[in-house]
């Protein structure tokens, strides 16, 4: 069999077309344009590139991106003050604090200062807790993007055994919670897991979120599994050895073009949703 390609790039483009119409309607009905505020602290080139990509995504659908740049010397107190200022600004519908921030800043305190209704990147503890409990909150952009991709391709999760490899607070942990909420049976594996291969061999769905190139070997994955690779490394490879799975897996997310496009797309999607709730 040939694996179904879960094309995140195509889905992101389709969603952008739909979001453009939503934004046009909001502008016409309310006279306001949805705004995503992005905060970049310091001059890390990779972070600057990510912020630019998010700004470009906003432009493509007619949204505005409010870019807030702060120096590397910024203190926790100064960053908290800026976040509170954006929280209080009714024209701002979403707030993104670009990770990582300089080491002197308490990143967790700053994430948690973002108002729940503007936490469109799903980074607050409150938002994570509400999401895990099945209450209304915006999900972390990457795992939420994965869930949207699986849903778009009608991948069955109910009763399936999903193995998530990785436990980061912005990917592995929320991914496991979202899969659990979708009635999957979930196993979380990490750097201290013993017999990792044995766990993965049992999986109907494998999510690679470990941050190491091709760490998960193709022979560990059973025939007919759904394979989701959330990694990206130089050379265009992910966390999973994908090539040998092209004719064994039921479905795979390509690298690049699978999970990656869905991350920024979900951030924009959730910002438009926040604006719709505010502007009607």
Curated annotation (Swiss-Prot):
GO terms (BP aspect): L-histidine biosynthetic process; methionine biosynthetic process; purine nucleotide biosynthetic process; tetrahydrofolate interconversion
EC number: 1.5.1.5, 3.5.4.9
Complex and partners: Homodimer.
Pathways involved: One-carbon metabolism; tetrahydrofolate interconversion
Disulfide bridge map: none
Phylogenetic classification of the source organism: Bacteria, Pseudomonadati, Pseudomonadota, Gammaproteobacteria, Cellvibrionales
Keywords: Amino-acid biosynthesis, Histidine biosynthesis, Hydrolase, Methionine biosynthesis, Multifunctional enzyme, NADP, One-carbon metabolism, Oxidoreductase, Purine biosynthesis
Statement: the UniProt record of this protein carries the keyword Signal: no
InterPro entries xref list: Aminoacid_DH-like_N_sf, NAD(P)-bd_dom_sf, THF_DH/CycHdrlase, THF_DH/CycHdrlase_cat_dom, THF_DH/CycHdrlase_CS, THF_DH/CycHdrlase_NAD-bd_dom
Catalytic activity: (6R)-5,10-methylene-5,6,7,8-tetrahydrofolate + NADP(+) = (6R)-5,10-methenyltetrahydrofolate + NADPH; (6R)-5,10-methenyltetrahydrofolate + H2O = (6R)-10-formyltetrahydrofolate + H(+)
Keyword Hydrolase: yes
CDD domains documented for this protein: NAD_bind_m-THF_DH_Cyclohyd
Entry GO CC: cytosol
Binding annotation for NADP(+): 166-168, 191
Record family assignment: Belongs to the tetrahydrofolate dehydrogenase/cyclohydrolase family.
Domain of life: Bacteria
Pfam family, one: THF_DHG_CYH_C
Primary role: Catalyzes the oxidation of 5,10-methylenetetrahydrofolate to 5,10-methenyltetrahydrofolate and then the hydrolysis of 5,10-methenyltetrahydrofolate to 10-formyltetrahydrofolate.
Record-given protein name: Bifunctional protein FolD
GO molecular function, one term: methenyltetrahydrofolate cyclohydrolase activity
